[in-house]
Amino acid sequence: VLSEDDKNRVRTSVGKNPELPGEYGSETLTRMFAAHPTTKTYFPHFDLSSGSPNLKAHGKKVIDALDNAVEGLDDAVATLSKLSDLHAQKLRVDPANFKILSQCLLSTLANHRNPEFGPAVLASVDKFLCNVSEVLESKYR
C-alpha cells in the first residue's frame, strides 16, 4: 500500500513530468530486450534496434500508461483495467514481464534522474510499479 508520502514522491518523479520523455520508455524497452531477450517474442513485427521508430512509439505508450496510472493512483484497478484486459486476453503477455519491465524502468529513471532519485524516491516508485504490475497481472487469474 502506498502511503501519502509515497504517492507524492511518485507524482513528482513519474507523473505527467515533461522531463520524463518517451525516450525513457524506448530506453527501458531496449534495456529489457538486452537483459531478457525472450521478451522480444512479443514484438516480431518491430525493429528492435536501439532508438528505432517502433521502440520510440511503444516506449511513449509505456510512459503514457504510467502517466495514466499516476493520475489514477487512488483507483489503480479501474485506471488500468483496459490495459490489463489487452495484455492478458488479446496479447497474452507473460505476466512475469511486467516486473521485468518495472525493473528496467527503475534502472532508466535512476540513471537519468540521479541524484534526485534517491533511496526514498526509489522505494516509492518501486512500490508504485509493483502495484501497477499486480493490477496488470490480476486479469490472468
Swiss-Prot record:
Protein keywords: Heme, Iron, Metal-binding, Oxygen transport, Transport
Tissue specificity annotation: Red blood cells.
Annotated stretches, region: Disordered: 1-22
Keyword Kinase: no
Binding site for heme b: H87
Pfam families, A to Z: Globin
GO BP annotations, alphabetical order: hydrogen peroxide catabolic process
UniProt-recorded Gene Ontology molecular function terms: haptoglobin binding; heme binding; metal ion binding; organic acid binding; oxygen binding; oxygen carrier activity; peroxidase activity
UniProt entry tagged with the keyword Heme: yes
Extra facts: This is one of two types of alpha chains found in viper hemoglobin.
Record-stated family: Belongs to the globin family.
Annotated protein name in UniProt: Hemoglobin subunit alpha
Naturally occurring in which organism (per UniProt): Vipera aspis (Aspic viper)
Taxonomic classification: Eukaryota, Metazoa, Chordata, Craniata, Vertebrata
Gene that encodes it: HBA
